[in-house]
């Protein structure tokens, strides 16, 4: 039994090997030889390069060549995609009528964002497209933001200028607290009394005090000659004190002195006067 099966297996293998190793017909061999090229060009030969150049010279369908003159005047060839339509005319700018602008401005004041049915209805009433209405509102919002930025800068400049002008006006009118030795800055008094100094101790003197009975009027002119800056004649007993007051620019009282020092020490008053410390004033009084 085993020998018969072995003989059958050997026969099958021989038949299969014969089928595989069977040569092709002469016709098939000739056809395959005719299809194969007889010679192959070398990789670096001129024929291969010429074929590659000829194939690359043909531009693809999505590209086109144009001649452009550069800054030096020489012509250059540029390859651009055909999708870039350079010959297309520019879109004409939309010109709105006065009625359309008035209606659009009124709607913008009411609501800065018009969308949906409101925009459709507004475009229909004004005989415009929704795109035109949308673009107009976008440009109007951009313009408003720019105007607000300019207004804020202008307000800051105007406020600084107004503050400077008010300070200069007050300095000219003499309403600011200033030393009495500076007649241009001291307000003239209509009526007042000059009180004699009270001696608090030996070797110490106190400054005279002034009491005004009427409020200051800015329209009054300075006092005539023969009167002091307080618009009252100086008594004979206080002649030396008046000379000291005219020679030393001192304030009338301690509170006024502190206030004037605060005012004069600020940056707005630096170009017009200099602040004097308490120590220097006390030294001048003792001298």
Curated annotation (Swiss-Prot):
Belongs to the EMX homeobox family. The keyword Transcription regulation applies. Residues 1-33 have a biased composition (Basic and acidic residues). Residues 89-148 bind DNA. Keywords: Developmental protein, DNA-binding, Homeobox, Nucleus, Transcription, Transcription regulation. This is Ventral anterior homeobox 1b. Residues 1-55 are annotated as: Disordered. Its main location: nucleus. It comes from the Eukaryota.
